């Protein structure tokens, strides 16, 4: 921050307490590494992420219902310059890439407005052992949002 900008910030009361954090440089969300699960009735979803290495995190998810495979997905998080890119290859569908629109120390949101559904995907850490993953896009009556509250689990299960 140059002297003129710092002086203006001080006059306007935008000191350290009100400073914004520079989000132009995305980082891989290392806090996502490990295994996560969601259990809702007969439905069980599990998502696994490798720790960041070589500028990439690899992930996979599997959802079963009544013990039968319902869907699976291969996932990739990588940096493209200063942008976090989330690439998903869902079972039976073409690969889709989403680019970061917001990245913080505890969350990230990626978007692809040209994709049918979802058009936005987000993850928000809630403490050491839980997170909310969500997808969002056009629905019958406006924006449709689905949230997936997940808890950390032992990867060996």
Give the ranges of each region predicted by the language model.
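Conserved strand-loop elements at the edges of beta-sheets that form or border functional pockets
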Residues: 30, 51, 125
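Well-ordered alpha/beta subsegment
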Residues: 106-112, 116-125, 132-136
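Edge beta-strand at a domain terminus
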Residues: 95, 100, 105, 130-157
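Bacterial Sec-dependent signal peptides at the C-terminal "C-region" and cleavage site
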Residues: 8-26
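Bacterial N-terminal signal peptides that target proteins for export
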Residues: 1-7
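Central antiparallel beta-sheet cores of small beta-barrel/beta-sandwich binding domains
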Residues: 23, 33, 38-114
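Beta-rich carbohydrate-recognition and catalytic domains
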Residues: 21-28, 33, 146-155
């Amino acid at each position: 921050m140059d002297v003129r900008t710092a002086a203006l910030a001080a006059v306007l009361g935008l000191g350290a307490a009100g400073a914004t954090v520079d989000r132009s440089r995305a980082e891989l969300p290392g806090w996502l590494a490990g295994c996560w699960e969601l259990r809702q009735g007969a439905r069980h979803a599990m998502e696994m992420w490798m720790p960041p290495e070589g500028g990439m995190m690899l992930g996979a998810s599997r959802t079963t219902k009544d013990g039968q495979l319902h869907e699976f997905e291969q996932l990739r998080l990588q940096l493209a310059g200063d942008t976090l890119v989330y690439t998903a290859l869902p079972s039976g569908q073409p690969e889709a890439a989403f680019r970061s629109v917001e990245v913080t120390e505890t969350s990230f949101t990626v978007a692809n407005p040209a994709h049918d559904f979802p058009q936005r995907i987000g993850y928000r850490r809630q403490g050491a052992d839980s997170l909310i993953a969500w997808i969002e896009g056009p629905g019958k009556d406006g924006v449709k949002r689905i949230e997936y509250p997940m808890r950390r689990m032992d990867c060996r299960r």
